Amino acid sequence: MQDTTLEVRLAELESRLAFQEVTIDELNQTVTAHELEMAKLRDLLRLLTEKVKATQSSHMASPSEETPPPHY
């Protein structure tokens, strides 16, 4: 009787292990995909930041070139 109980418990543990291995593989794939996406987004953010800085510096006058605001 005890051997049957041990066999059932062992089978249950093996089943859980198999499901855990599948889950770990899926999570690993998800993490890898997210890392690639984050790298692309970092590159895009860097590019957009450079474009915004270039646009701001070319379209905005320096404070010394600005005319003073009218006084009331």
From Swiss-Prot:
Gene behind this chain? slyX
Supply the source organism for this entry.
Enterobacter sp. (strain 638)
Residue stretches spanning the membrane: none
Report what the protein is called. Answer: Protein SlyX
Q: For the region Disordered, what residue ranges are annotated?
A: 53-72
Family note: Belongs to the SlyX family.
Q: Name one Pfam family in it.
A: SlyX
Give the superkingdom in one word.
Bacteria
NCBIfam families per the UniProt record, alphabetical:
PRK02793.1
Regions of compositional bias (Polar residues) in chain numbering:
54-65
